[in-house]
């Protein structure tokens, strides 16, 4: 199956000959008003694939992130659990049940890691330390910064995130799309999880969207 893109728009998907004949068709990704949560994983009632919006607590999930969720659920139908999506700047935790995104929680951890010059490989002791005492995060970060312990910086940030997102991973099945140190962090806490390639999930999401649109 071939995917023809025009910027952020999927022009078509299918055999090359079909794409050449039908390039006028398009499905904007994230271009429409977002769907309020809870919402089906895939919804193209508006002709494209919008993102998600949550009122309380306020959150926004872009259309391309939603596409990755759709790709994961396409390969794991009837999956019930939490997806942790690690991007360049943000981490999203999404509760999935009955082919719906029920709720979400997002964090600036990865952006803070970049600003504070943290390592890609978190220190596991730092994760546990701040997970246990998240109120000491600022102090822990200053100590790690003074010691130039870049792994500890990342560990403390992820530990604080895990403390805040405890309801999303404690006692739940977790799928990690991307990494950013989250696989090691969850493994250290004994959380059952599986790891998945986000780009592969995105490609599968495009295929699922194309099928839903009848391409």
Regions found by a protein language model. Name each.
Residues 1-83, 94-215:
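Nucleotide/phosphate-binding catalytic cleft detector across ATP-hydrolyzing
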């Amino acid at each position: 199956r071939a995917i023809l893109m025009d910027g952020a728009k999927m022009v078509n998907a299918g055999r090359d000959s079909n794409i050449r004949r039908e390039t006028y068709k398009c499905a904007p990704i994230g271009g429409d008003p977002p769907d309020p949560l809870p919402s089906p994983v895939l919804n193209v009632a508006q002709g494209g694939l919008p993102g998600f919006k949550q009122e309380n607590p306020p959150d926004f999930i872009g259309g391309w992130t939603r596409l990755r969720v759709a790709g994961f659920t396409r390969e794991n139908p009837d999956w019930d659990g939490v997806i942790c999506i690690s991007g360049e700047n943000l981490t999203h935790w999404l509760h999935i049940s009955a082919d719906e995104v029920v709720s979400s929680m997002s964090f600036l951890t990865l952006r803070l890691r970049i600003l504070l010059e943290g390592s890609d490989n978190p220190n596991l002791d730092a994760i546990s330390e701040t997970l246990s005492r998240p109120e000491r995060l600022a102090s822990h970060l200053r100590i790690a910064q003074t010691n130039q312990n870049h792994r500890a910086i990342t560990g403390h940030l992820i530990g604080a995130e895990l403390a805040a997102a405890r309801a999303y991973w404690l006692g739940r099945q977790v799928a990690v799309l991307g990494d950013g140190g989250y696989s090691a962090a969850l493994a250290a806490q004994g959380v059952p999880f599986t790891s998945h390639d986000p780009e592969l999930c995105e490609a599968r999401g495009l295929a699922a969207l194309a099928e839903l649109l009848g391409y």
